[in-house]
Amino acid sequence: MHASLVIMAAGIGSRYGGNKQTDGVGPHGEILMEYGVYDAVRAGFDKVVFIIKPDMRELMERLCGRMAAGLRTADGCPVEVCYAYQDSTSLPAWYTAPEGRTKPFGTAHAVLCTRELVHEPFCVINADDYYGVDAYRTMYSALRTIPAEGAAAMVGYMLRNTVTAHGTVSRGVCHVKDGCLTDIHETLKIALLPDGTIRDEDTGTVLAGDTVVSMNFWGFTPSIFGELERYFHAFLRSEAGQSVKAECLLPTMVGDLLAQGRLTVSVLHSADRWFGMTYHEDRARVAQELVKLHETGVYPAELR
């Protein structure tokens, strides 16, 4: 089966304090995207699509694109590498962005930007997260049997394993019944308190550590692009479309489609642990975890 890995790498790492997508954190300077690409190809994915800003093309080719192009699938074929640009040229002609808008329009728009490049089942990930080897195998297996219309999948993680002591995080808090997602709420300020309590700072609600959350590890078929276009255009026509900061988010779109009965989402689970770099202070821990994975043979001495 042909399947694509779509990597969202155009976002600005404001909370991290720089461009965390291109920060070499592995023992030989590997960036987190390289681990995602390596794991996906091992799982069976044979195309990689990087969503970037146009001025990132040369940098992305050097940091990860060439590495991806040098990989081979299980049957010895080269991995196809493509680049999708998330910028103003991907906006509809009838829309004029508000003055001062420099921020990307969010993850739903990012995935929509790959429409002309992706014609097979695909997995979407963040560029700055480590999801684990098993997550890609699990998703690839799910995509082999996913219906062409009205169905999707996601890999869920326990909230307690996705928070940081260095500040608040944004997570898609999920409600799951019989293995399917029934609701997802993008919660923007989740804090880990000194006593281990996890709280939504906006509402004061205490969240259970075993709450399933989305880390933007999604599986879709190309039929999702029609839904993405409709949702994004509605966003642009709304008051949010005139904001310089509002974002059109993928989890929010999924939640709306669930509520309308237009999408069924299977919730998958991975045996591996997620980790990532929301803040610069997270970097040392991530680097230590990656060293352990190389030392225990999960990865070769060097990925490149």
Residue spans for each PLM region:
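N-terminal glycine-rich phosphate-binding loop and ensuing alpha1 helix
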Residues: M1-L71, E120
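Short phosphate-binding loop-to-helix
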Residues: A69-P121
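Hydrophobic packing residues within well-ordered alpha-helices of enzyme cores
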Residues: M60-C64, M139, L228, V286
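Conserved active-site beta-strand element of glycosyltransferases/polysaccharide synthases
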Residues: G219, V265-L268, G276
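Conserved core of the sugar-phosphate nucleotidyltransferase
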Residues: V133-W218, P222
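Short beta-strand-to-loop acidic/aromatic patch adjacent to the donor-nucleotide binding site
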Residues: E120-Y130
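A C-terminal functional module that forms or caps the active site or interfaces directly
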Residues: E229-L263
